Amino acid sequence: AIREFLQANARLDSTIAQVASSRSEVIRVSAFASMAMHWLPSIIRRFREERPDVDVDIRMADHIRSPYELLAQGKMDVIFVSHQEEESGYEWIHLRDDTMYAVLPKDYPIDGRTGHPLSEFDGRDFIMPAQGFDKDIMRIFNRVGVKPHILPTAVDDPTVISMVEHGLGVSMMTELTLRGRGDGVLLVPVEPKSARELGMAVRAGEGRQ
């Protein structure tokens, strides 16, 4: 795992240097909110070390597909997202797997378990997180044949957590998204262990210039 991290870090540094060297004024970056909050400050510092004369324009992603679309249209130079195999025309740098957690009310009967079976989501009121998480989450549910009752909501992550806290349903979020949150709810890793793959993407050929 350490070797994989070091290799990913080396590839990240190399790609940042290559993208930075090919831009004359602005490097355009799109990222999920959780990645922007926890990772982008250090990554932007790397860009500035490579090219202090180039500005970094950061845009928050409001859905899984939008960063890929912006990248394909040439409106973004770099995106930090979850891996979507059906998308094409980009080079992918894996950074880490982001573990999925069940988000449950405090009074949920977990009976001392250290993991939450995915099967227990079946038929339950489910509050879908923000940022188009549905693709990553539904891929996991479909893999095990689970069909929760997805509530018609379009709210941000803190609101999802608050709704769960007040007993309005359950949810599933990742470790990175939940960092520093969740005091009013139970956070239990799902079983079987599931994760979304997070990384950096550039247009095909961009990382080799």
What feature does the model see in each segment?
Residues 1-18:
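Alpha-helical "hinge/linker" immediately C-terminal to small N-terminal DNA-binding modules
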Residues 20-21, 87-126:
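Flexible hinge/capping segments at coil-to-helix
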Residues 24-88, 154:
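Central regulatory/effector-binding core of bacterial HTH transcription factors
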Residues 39, 135, 186-209:
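A late-sequence structural motif
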Residues 54, 71-80, 100, 146, ...:
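Alpha-to-beta junction loops
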Residues 82, 110, 124-144, 209:
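Secondary-structure junction motif
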Residues 82-89, 139, 143, 157-185:
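A ligand-binding cleft/hinge motif common to bilobed small-molecule-binding domains
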Residues 91-101, 152, 171-176, 183-197:
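Short beta-strand->loop
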